[in-house]
From Swiss-Prot:
GO terms for molecular function: 8-oxo-7,8-dihydroguanine DNA N-glycosylase activity; class I DNA-(apurinic or apyrimidinic site) endonuclease activity; damaged DNA binding; zinc ion binding. This is Formamidopyrimidine-DNA glycosylase. Its cofactor is Zn(2+). DNA binds at H104, R123, K166. It comes from Bradyrhizobium sp. (strain BTAi1 / ATCC BAA-1182). A zinc finger (FPG-type) spans 257-293. The keyword Transmembrane does not apply. Keywords: DNA damage, DNA repair, DNA-binding, Glycosidase, Hydrolase, Lyase, Metal-binding, Multifunctional enzyme, Zinc, Zinc-finger.
Length: 293
């Protein structure tokens, strides 16, 4: 599933052709994705100007001139493609040419900017939903989300407070979207490695008995910031389905330190350890037992 860097990469790719442009027409080419489309979905979007395109955790939010918000989630395999009228592209180093088969092109936005925005989702776990601007805080998919890890409010003190007294593992706590929003398996593994913290460590150890942040909390927040920012600059990680809106692959997977590197040498200078994998809460965890404590 796309994580925060992949969704932010998509947002930045859509922003130039969506923000300030009008949705001339919208097509929903089937009745549902993960959930059924609202009966008047396409009609409500037609003629609306996109005033802004934001992101909350792994969700995209298009602010519409009607006062509504278009909530979008990529699901497991969803991707957006921007097709301009001239359809000219300058492929990057990691460009992956998408085929012409449009059987999985389920939603199309025809924009006044001259671009068609196509949502392709083979597994149909993505969804789109129109909500009122005043309903955002009550929206079930958004209301319980924790702070944005790249937001100004997310710091060691906030993370320590959220983890104080927790008896769960550090990795499980970071994957809890109520603790911090948008992190997934890949970037949690990578951040824990950079902070030299074991995924099995108790989350409560990020706080002192007085609830103040420990050194571990400060190192971890720095690592989360670094990993996410580097991944966004690299266009995210393309392991299966993620593509940028140009069709280009993300390439942060070439910078993985532990994720999907089972049996390979640890990249920490002087460590000499080997990357291991174990199943934790139903997901593969990659780590170096020698330098992550």
């Amino acid at each position: 599933m796309p994580e925060l860097p992949e969704v932010e990469t998509v947002r930045r790719g859509l922003q130039p052709v969506m923000e300030g442009a009008k949705i001339v027409a919208a097509e929903a080419r089937r009745g549902d994705l993960r959930f059924p489309f609202q009966p008047d979905f396409a009609k409500r979007l037609q003629g609306q100007t996109v005033r802004g395109l934001g992101r909350r955790a792994k969700y995209l939010l298009a602010d519409l001139s009607s006062g509504d918000v278009l909530l979008m989630h990529l699901g497991m395999s969803g991707s957006f493609r921007v097709i301009k009228q001239d359809d000219e592209e300058t492929p990057g180093e990691f460009h992956y040419p998408r085929g012409k088969d449009s059987v999985h092109d389920h939603v199309v936005f025809h924009m006044s900017s001259g671009a068609d925005i196509v949502f392709n989702d083979p597994r149909r776990f993505g969804f789109m939903k129109i909500i009122g601007r005043g309903e955002i805080e009550r929206e079930p998919h958004l209301k319980d989300l924790g702070p944005e890890p790249l937001g100004n409010e997310f710091d060691a003190a906030m993370l320590a407070t959220a983890c104080a007294g927790k008896k769960t593992s550090l990795k499980a706590a970071l994957l809890d979207q109520r603790v911090v929003a948008g992190l997934g398996n890949i970037y949690v593994c990578e951040a824990l490695f950079r902070a030299h913290l074991s995924p099995r460590r108790l989350a409560a150890t990020l706080a002192t008995r007085k609830g103040e942040p420990t050194d571990h909390a400060r190192r971890l927040v720095e690592a989360i910031h670094a990993v996410l920012n580097e991944a966004i600059r690299a266009g995210g990680s393309s392991l299966r389905d993620h593509r940028q809106t140009s069709g280009e692959l993300g390439y942060f997977q070439h910078s993985f330190q532990v994720y999907d590197r089972e049996g390979e040498p640890c990249r920490t200078d002087g460590c000499g350890g080997v990357v291991k994998r174990f199943v934790q809460n139903g997901r593969s965890t990659f780590w170096c037992p020698k330098c992550q404590r």
